[in-house]
Regions:
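Single conserved hydrophobic/aromatic residue that forms the stacking wall/gate
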Residues: 1-11
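Non-catalytic terminal extensions of PLP-dependent enzymes
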Residues: 12-183
Length: 183
């Protein structure tokens, strides 16, 4: 039923909150410090101190095998996490582990360093296997920051793009519609 699903989502959200609250500031909690079926993590301070923005975190999550949650809505510089009832505990734990690992990466960055692991994310297979590697971190750190990725890696097909430009200049790379009609 709907009530059962809502309870499950709230339980999952509370679990995630408990796992990551030492590493991320959570906005808009209730009187008892709880969040409902979604939470907003505040990433704004990282920009000033480390030069890392919410989009850098979102792009790095791709290297960990996760599609980035909603960013900068409803609050600019934040990330909204909404676990669904279909996500099992193992997947939620992997997601929390990824966020905690990313926080550890953030604090190694400096404000003026635009050539760090987060700013270069996501890392494609083509990038990682190229002859040239001009980064101050290893290929393993880029591709396999946590051990579960060694046996279950999802590779991004593109590296960092200008999101605003891409949103304004969407170009379909599909075959012409006639090719699909023939088949």
């Amino acid at each position: 039923t709907a009530n059962r699903r809502q309870r499950q989502m709230c339980i999952r959200d509370s679990y995630i909150k408990k796992r990551i609250e030492k590493d991320y500031k959570i906005l808009y909690t209730g009187e008892l410090g709880r969040s409902a079926h979604e939470m907003i993590i505040d990433c704004r301070d990282y920009k000033e101190e480390y030069g890392i923005g919410v989009m850098d975190i979102a792009k790095r999550l791709i290297d960990y095998g996760f599609h980035a949650p909603t960013v900068s809505f409803p609050v600019p510089g934040t990330m909204m996490i909404e676990p669904t009832e279909s996500e099992n505990l193992d997947e939620i734990d992997r997601f929390c582990d990824a966020l905690i690992s990313i926080k550890a990466e953030i604090i190694t960055c400096t404000k003026d360093d635009t050539h760090n692991i987060l700013k270069n994310s996501p890392h494609t297979l083509e990038t990682l296997t190229s002859e040239v590697w001009n980064h101050n971190y290893s290929r393993k750190e880029a591709a396999y920051p946590l051990s579960y990725l060694e046996s279950n890696k999802f590779w991004p097909t593109v590296t960092r793009i200008d999101d605003a430009f891409g949103d304004r200049n969407l170009i379909c790379t599909c075959n012409p519609i006639e090719d699909y009609i023939k088949s």
